[in-house]
Amino acid sequence: MKVVLMGPPGAGKGTQARKISEKYGIPQLSTGDMLRAAVAAGSEVGLRAKAAMESGSLVTDEIVLGIIQDRTDEADCDQGYLLDGFPRTLAQAEGLDAMLAKRNQSIDVVIDIKVEDEPLVARITGRSSCEKCGEGYHDSFKPSAQPNVCDKCSGTLKRRADDNADTVRNRLEVYHKQTAPLIGYYDAKGLLKEVDGMQEMGKVLEDLCAILG
């Protein structure tokens, strides 16, 4: 089972990907984690990625696809895997399909977690976390007992600098521009499924599992 999980920033992709990974026994593959692991391991493609990052260049699609190819060759991917946040562009989707086609493989399903922009802005801008223990909080959904103080360890709660409304709206605009062609691409292949990400997290997971079987 080879799954692509899509959704805008703050839609809860990472959380749902972890739960799916645990339930189905397939690894969650995020490009950031794979990139860091490849650089740390000093693999050929990892060294190319490191050189690009150190020179201030973008890590190319070719390098990212090389990292995904190496990672999906590992034994824990034999029964499948879940790609979290990749591909992000049509070129990446086409590159991924071409890479898999060389192995006589293909993506089985693409799930898009749909969330409306303004509720998502409220969801993201309300987030904070403890500087000391990392516990997460939210102004509306999980407020701390005392403002800006962690319930667990009494550490100070901080917000990410990029979790302000203007930055979030810009990130969402970029996401929609990049991924709109992807929706059509995967829909035309009959691979696209959609889940309402505005629901309670347990219900979102239930709907995801209903698709995955």
UniProtKB/Swiss-Prot annotation:
It comes from the Bacteria. It is found in: Cytoplasm. Transmembrane segments: none annotated. Its EC number is 2.7.4.3. Zn(2+) binds at C130, C133, C150, C153. Keywords: ATP-binding, Cytoplasm, Kinase, Metal-binding, Nucleotide biosynthesis, Nucleotide-binding, Transferase, Zinc. It catalyses: AMP + ATP = 2 ADP. SUPFAM superfamilies: P-loop containing nucleoside triphosphate hydrolases. Residues 126-163 are annotated as: LID. GO terms for biological process: AMP salvage. One of its GO terms (molecular function) is zinc ion binding. AMP binds at T31, R36, S57, L58, V59, G85, F86, P87, R88, Q92, R160, R171. Pathway: Purine metabolism; AMP biosynthesis via salvage pathway; AMP from ADP: step 1/1. Catalyzes the reversible transfer of the terminal phosphate group between ATP and AMP. Plays an important role in cellular energy homeostasis and in adenine nucleotide metabolism. Monomer. NCBIfam families: adk, PRK00279.1-2, PRK00279.1-3, PRK14527.1, PRK14532.1. Belongs to the adenylate kinase family. Consists of three domains, a large central CORE domain and two small peripheral domains, NMPbind and LID, which undergo movements during catalysis. The LID domain closes over the site of phosphoryl transfer upon ATP binding. Assembling and dissambling the active center during each catalytic cycle provides an effective means to prevent ATP hydrolysis. Some bacteria have evolved a zinc-coordinating structure that stabilizes the LID domain. This is Adenylate kinase.
